């Protein structure tokens, strides 16, 4: 499949925000439209997942190790502490369960939505620094976790018992900040902060298209394919961005 690589449209789009809230200009490619941007009361948000019912979002902070559930504009609804350091990803497993990615310990840790520890497993990556796994998603079709390594571009799949089932290398971006499985279309979305791009791939890692934006230090992405909505979080800006995408 020949990918469609759009040209970045340098237009300041301010989006729909609460009255009186400061906004920041955002540029996007023509197949991506900014709908809104919202300040988050979450320090260094890193990782993002849409709830199973599409009514809320899950986020983690890599500063305080807390998991947050928010509404679709980023207002905190509930939270729980994990006791973990340097959280970099979160994924919804089902309506009652989420999993987080601990970068330094190279672990996937599963919690109930109320914060009860349910299980944990090691990822087969060496080291204990902050150049490890950066993105986490759950594929309900195969019942596998999908992990992406930030620098090397390793994409690792693990089953529900945390056993590695496959390992592949991504080579199309400067780094790999986040990943999310689109179960509705059986596709993958990969976020690259340094490349300023979001990539849509088949499960066989063939690129279908890409989207460009200058959102600063993007650290998490999740999709609502039914409504053609993309949610992105920025770590240093502590902001949630809502965008509409065109994948035709």
How does the language model describe each region?
Residues 17-18:
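C-terminal motif of bacterial Sec signal peptides marking the signal peptidase cleavage site
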Residues 24-43:
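A short helix->beta-strand "capping" segment at the edge of beta-propeller domains
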Residues 33-39, 75-81, 118-127, 163-170, ...:
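A short beta-strand motif characteristic of beta-propeller blades
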Residues 40-53, 83-95, 126-141, 172-186, ...:
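Beta-rich, blade/repeat-based domains predominating
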Residues 41, 51, 58-63, 99-106, ...:
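Conserved beta-strand positions in repeat-built beta-propeller and related beta-rich domains
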Residues 66-68, 107-109, 154-157, 197-200, ...:
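Structural motif
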Residues 71-75, 112-116, 159-163, 201-206, ...:
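Short loop/turn segments that connect beta-strands within beta-propeller blades
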Residues 224-248:
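Blade-level signature of beta-propeller repeat domains, shared across WD40, Kelch, NHL, RCC1
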């Amino acid at each position: 499949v020949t990918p469609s690589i759009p040209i970045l449209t340098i237009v300041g789009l301010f989006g729909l925000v609460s009255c009186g809230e400061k906004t920041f200009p955002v540029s996007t490619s023509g197949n991506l439209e900014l709908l809104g941007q919202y300040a988050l009361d979450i320090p260094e948000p890193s990782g993002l997942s849409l709830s199973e019912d599409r009514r809320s979002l899950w986020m983690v902070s890599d500063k305080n190790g807390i998991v947050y559930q928010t509404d679709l504009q980023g207002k905190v609804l509930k939270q729980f502490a994990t006791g973990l350091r340097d959280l970099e990803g979160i994924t919804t497993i089902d309506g009652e369960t989420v999993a987080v990615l601990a970068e330094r310990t190279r672990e996937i840790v599963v919690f109930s939505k109320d914060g009860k520890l349910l299980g944990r497993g090691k990822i087969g990556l060496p080291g204990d620094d902050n150049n490890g796994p950066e993105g986490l998603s759950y594929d309900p079709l195969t019942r596998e976790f999908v992990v992406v390594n930030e620098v090397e571009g390793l994409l690792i799949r693990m089953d529900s018992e945390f056993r590695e089932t496959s390992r592949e290398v991504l080579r199309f971006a400067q780094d790999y900040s986040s990943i999310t499985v689109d179960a509705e279309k059986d596709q993958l979305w990969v976020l690259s902060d340094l490349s300023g791009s979001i990539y849509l791939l088949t499960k066989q890692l063939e690129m279908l298209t890409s989207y460009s934006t200058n959102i600063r230090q993007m650290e998490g992405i999740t999709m609502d394919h039914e409504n053609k909505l993309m949610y992105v979080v920025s770590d240093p800006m502590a902001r949630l961005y809502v965008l509409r995408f065109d994948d035709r």
